[in-house]
Amino acid sequence: MIRRTQALSLLLVAWLLAGCALAPPAGQPAAGGPRIANLRFDPETVPAGATTRMSFYFEVGGADLEEGFLIERGISQFQFYQAFQPIPVDLRSYSGQVAGTAEVPLRWNSLGVRILELYVVTKQGQASNRLRATLTVR
């Protein structure tokens, strides 16, 4: 009986984690739109209230990077959740650069495992491809 319960619990967790992948794939941006790559959090595991550094590589044809958006999904207190509003990230300090690596400090106060999806937008409103990375807050 215990093995069956453990197997069902494992199956449920796998099913919930697979649900994180139901969003559209991180495809290609529109022609002439910005591209991002290599999304990372350093460190990937942080204590609650501590700061982590999000970094990613970007290429923008018109050198007019405006802002980014983080879509937050995750598991916290044994519940799967998804944020209703994307979290805006100010990237105006990188305006004027055609390519480079952006580094943004982020702070999380609530515990849990987060799957964060990032995309950036230019001043003309062109959106980039989307990238995902995992961050654990303990």
Where are these predicted regions, by residue range?
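Surface-exposed, short loops/turns at beta-strand junctions within beta-sandwich domains
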Residues: 98, 107-112
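Extracellular acidic, Ser/Thr/Pro-rich low-complexity tracts
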Residues: 58-62
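Short Trp-Ser/Thr-centered turn/loop motifs at beta-strand boundaries
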Residues: 128-130
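Bacterial Sec signal peptide processing site at the extreme N-terminus
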Residues: 20-34
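Bacterial N-terminal signal peptides
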Residues: 9-19
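Extracellular Ig-like/FN3 beta-sandwich strand-entry sites
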Residues: 51, 65, 111-115
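Aromatic sugar-binding surface patches on proteins
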Residues: 92-103
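Short beta-strand segments of immunoglobulin-like
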Residues: 41-46
